[in-house]
């Protein structure tokens, strides 16, 4: 005799998850809009305006992905329920297995739609930059910044992303004052965008001869790589461009010349820097690309009332804007936004971040 209840529970779970997505993705409004778009595309004169026709075609594809998938899920769950009833009546294991197989397919489709829900932002599919900045705590904070860099590099490697270290500024004694890395791969920004914020470390400091407990802070800021054709106006008069000798890993080849470049956008006080190439010209181009991306994110955050502005995220590297607390002596890491925590601190510092990231994405942060 086959197990009926687990399958019934799965059907209920799929039904509940589909209902949540139907509301979140505003299925009714999208279905109505899809009908309107289809009607417009059927008009004989639609291609008199090619750009509008292309935009409508793109909108239709996006709407169909949601509407069709939810329709298929609704119909599929009705079909599976019917197959399960037949299997029970006829005591037919083959029909039962067919119902389970259909359920697996539906689960996969729903998972793809849930993925879309998490990554629905305009630039979620883009590559991204990650800036790390040591804050309160001196050498301890600078060592913490280097630990965070290692953590994110390990995470990116495990996810199959490529990384480039754009800039590293060594700490006074150990660690890093700042670093910028580029993460390359599908949905890199989508995965990392909720990591922006202040990360707090509490531990017995290896730099304290008395072995006392120290609290230190470092900030992370994530922003997407933007297309070159995005129109972001930058007035050259608003820029201060400094050149300096590179430091940090990889800087040994360029230390003899001032090839590293730092660009400050004076109106916003946004700073970008690059030192990963021997050519000052190439470093300047890369720093300008980062500046363009940061300014774009700055404008997007200003427009979104539900997000903190860039100035808030960057200003107070201290208690005010923490997202996660890493208390190593107590073996406890806790996300202060979602409440997710773990005692496997070493795994997290080795890059096992998905538990935290997925919770923040599902919470819509």
Swiss-Prot record:
Supply the SMART domains for this chain: PCRF
What GO cellular component is one of the record's annotations?
A: cytoplasm
Q: Which UniProt keywords apply?
A: Cytoplasm, Methylation, Protein biosynthesis
Post-translation changes: Methylated by PrmC. Methylation increases the termination efficiency of RF2.
Q: Which residues carry this modification: N5-methylglutamine?
A: 252
Q: Locate the coiled-coil region(s) and give their ranges.
A: none
Query: What InterPro entries does the annotation carry?
Result: PCRF, Pep_chain_release_fac_I, Pep_chain_release_fac_I_sf, PrfB
Note the superkingdom of the native organism.
Answer: Bacteria
Picking any one GO molecular function of the record gives: translation release factor activity, codon specific
Share an example GO biological-process annotation for this protein.
Answer: viral translational frameshifting
Which cellular compartments is it found in? Cytoplasm
Q: What else is known?
A: The gene for this protein contains a UGA in-frame termination codon after Leu-25; a naturally occurring frameshift enables complete translation of RF-2. This provides a mechanism for the protein to regulate its own production.
**PANTHER family, per database record:** CLASS I PEPTIDE CHAIN RELEASE FACTOR, PEPTIDE CHAIN RELEASE FACTOR 2
Function of this protein? Peptide chain release factor 2 directs the termination of translation in response to the peptide chain termination codons UGA and UAA.
Q: Which family is this protein grouped under?
A: Belongs to the prokaryotic/mitochondrial release factor family.
Please give the name of this protein.
Peptide chain release factor 2
